[in-house]
Regions:
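Short hydrophobic alpha-helices at membrane interfaces in multi-pass membrane enzymes
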Residues: 1-10
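Transmembrane helix irregularities
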Residues: 10-19, 172
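Perimembrane helix-loop-helix junctions
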Residues: 22-55
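Extracytoplasmic
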Residues: 74, 236-395
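Membrane-helix boundary/interfacial segments in multi-pass membrane proteins
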Residues: 76-81, 110-131, 152-203, 319, ...
Length: 395
């Protein structure tokens, strides 16, 4: 079992740093509680070994990034984590009870809409524990409180301490926020640990239910009726979970909108490839940084849409922000349109692609100005009208 624990720690270290972080925290928390209960130093040493295995895997996964940083210098702009995000995306207990907007029950979906219309801080909207998950969480809380009231501290489930720690650490304004105020803002989205709470409570409920079943059935023999009732209860629970957790399917109208967008993007890209030389570079407007830098009217990664269907075109969007290689793009915004286009052509770009959603007046002034500059070759326009490509070629 010791080697299994080491292996689990190492595998966790290979995954997203959020879950490496919580594994190490909960492992150390469990070791401290067990040491307090049993005064066992081997427990502490085992926990430290698991944490060391996770740390070793974390180092292995990030070694290339760190060596690149040593060779090329730090990139302070690549991953910006401001303190405000720790407050906005912190874990909120009430959000564990708020169903998604896509819930199959119109009553619950309406409750979610009403909540989101007035709530000042909205997280990533994925903290809902579900009916069964909430029942297990409340059951765990009841067992823990009852044990404390009866002065049976040793009987408080370890899982209760783990959930309590997650809440204290990652809730809005919690210990993670204190660390953030001191400058450590890496773990900005404490709400993501809601899935860990669900996993802990469900596993505890299964173990607790199995223990109760063994106690009730000790010395008894189940007859067919009892087995049938148990099976029916399990099936009913599964049906509730599926109904509660699987979102309402999109309507035909919603599917049709997505299909039109996909078909439009695919056809638009095919027209660009037919009109431009193989390997041509396309400068995309509005100028956006990557990653996580949206502009009004566009999501952060809208510029990737043509890339999904391209075979031989190259695009200006997608280089990691913070490095000097692409700083010239941001400088274009300080120049006149004529100077900016001249610089774009000088760097070898064959066309300008405009997402009209990212501009006031749907970018019509820019398109008119380009035509006035002599780029009057017929533009390539997507079927949905939001994308337009203007070749930088004068007749």
């Amino acid at each position: 079992r010791w080697w299994w624990a080491i292996a689990i720690g190492f595998i966790a270290g290979l995954h997203h740093v959020y879950y490496t972080n919580i594994l190490c925290q909960l492992t150390l928390l469990g070791a401290v509680i067990q040491f307090r209960r049993h005064r066992s130093f081997p427990v502490l040493l085992s926990a430290l070994a698991v944490i060391a295995a996770a740390a070793a895997a974390f180092v292995l996964m990030n070694l290339d990034t760190w060596t690149y940083k040593l060779a090329h210098g730090a990139n302070g702009g690549a991953m910006v984590r401001e303190y405000q995000w720790l407050e906005l995306y912190g874990l909120k207990i009430k959000d564990l009870f708020v169903p998604p907007l896509s819930h199959r029950s119109e009553l619950l979906a309406g409750f979610s809409r009403s909540h989101r219309a007035v709530a000042p801080l909205l997280d990533e909207r994925a903290s809902y524990q579900g009916i069964v998950g909430l029942a297990c969480l409340l059951w765990l809380a009841f067992e823990a409180v009852r044990a404390m009231l009866d002065r049976r501290e040793r009987d408080v489930p370890m899982e209760a301490w783990q959930v309590l720690w997650i809440v204290l650490m990652f809730t809005t304004g919690g210990l993670n926020a204190i660390l953030g105020a001191a400058g450590f803002t890496l773990f900005r989205s404490g709400c993501r640990y809601s899935i860990v709470i669900m996993a802990i409570t469900l596993l505890w409920a299964v173990r607790r239910g199995s223990t109760l079943e063994r106690g009730v059935m000790r010395g008894r023999v189940l007859n067919g009726a009892a087995l049938g009732m148990a099976g029916a209860a399990a099936v009913a629970a599964c049906m509730v979970i599926v109904w509660d957790e699987v979102p309402r399917p999109p309507t035909k109208e919603e599917v049709a909108v997505i299909a039109r967008q996909v078909d439009s993007d695919r056809a638009f890209t095919a027209k660009m490839e037919a009109a431009l030389p193989e390997g041509a570079m396309i400068f995309q407007l509005p100028i956006m940084e990557f990653p996580e830098a949206p502009v009004p009217g566009m999501t952060p990664y809208d510029h990737f849409r043509p890339y999904l269907y391209s075979r031989n075109l190259r695009y200006s969007f997608g280089s990691m922000k913070g490095r000097p290689r692409e700083a010239w793009q941001q400088e274009l915004g300080k120049r006149s349109l004529e100077e900016a286009v001249a610089e774009i052509e000088k760097r070898g770009f064959a066309a300008v692609s405009i997402n009209r959603n990212g501009f006031p007046e749907r970018a019509q002034p820019i398109e008119k100005a380009l035509r006035a500059m002599g780029y009057s070759k017929p533009p390539i326009v997507s079927a949905t009208g939001d994308l337009v490509c203007i070749p930088l070629e004068k007749p």
